[in-house]
Amino acid sequence: MGEKMYIIGIVGRSYFNKDNQEIFQIHESIRRVLTKYDDILPICLLPTEDYSYHNHIIGKDIVNKDKLDFILDKCDGFIVPGGTYFHNFDEYIINYAIKKDKPLLGICLGYQLMFSMFAKNRNKFDMTLRLKGNSHYGNSKKYLHKVNIIENTRLSKIVNKSCIPVNSVHKDAVMFDMNKLVINAVSDDGVIEGVEYPKRKFIIGLEWHPECLFDEYSKLIFDSFIKSIKKEPK
């Protein structure tokens, strides 16, 4: 294997199997997308603390930071995928990526956590706005609505469109003011669909699931993410 390989750490998600055993997994759709890039190695990132991750949400500091930093230092980029709860483990990785300027893509819950971390009123934001009806919850493999791309954002330069169709599998939304992040996508009903952290190679969060569609716009997003990891021209 002569060519340089790049490691992308995917945050693992916890669930309980039929025997009520806590299992860690990664989203298969994300793994499959990354296998399309020959020089990318996806790995699963696991918590380094001795606790039930499924029940451990934001609030308690990470003790084994040196152990976690050891594996994060090996990664060239990160994906924080969808899930159910905000975790301090996820938050630590997002802060690490920002501090070290390593590319990171937040998807669905990962995006919502990014938004929460930089909200002006964190306690208020931790209870995300509950959407009424199912206007944002559908089949991950099909388009459900469109999002308007904000001009002069990193995302607008990536997709080169003012509006794109997206899938949607979320029942919560974010509509609060925040610090530091830049809004890059909004749906017609006012729901914020994407954000990005300025002055970094690639720190972008999206409410939709580009890994499930992997259409022309999703491919542009992942291509830009990978190029940022390789430090190639965008």
Q: What role is predicted for each listed range?
A:
Residues 204-208:
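Active-site-proximal beta-strand elements of phosphoester/diester hydrolases
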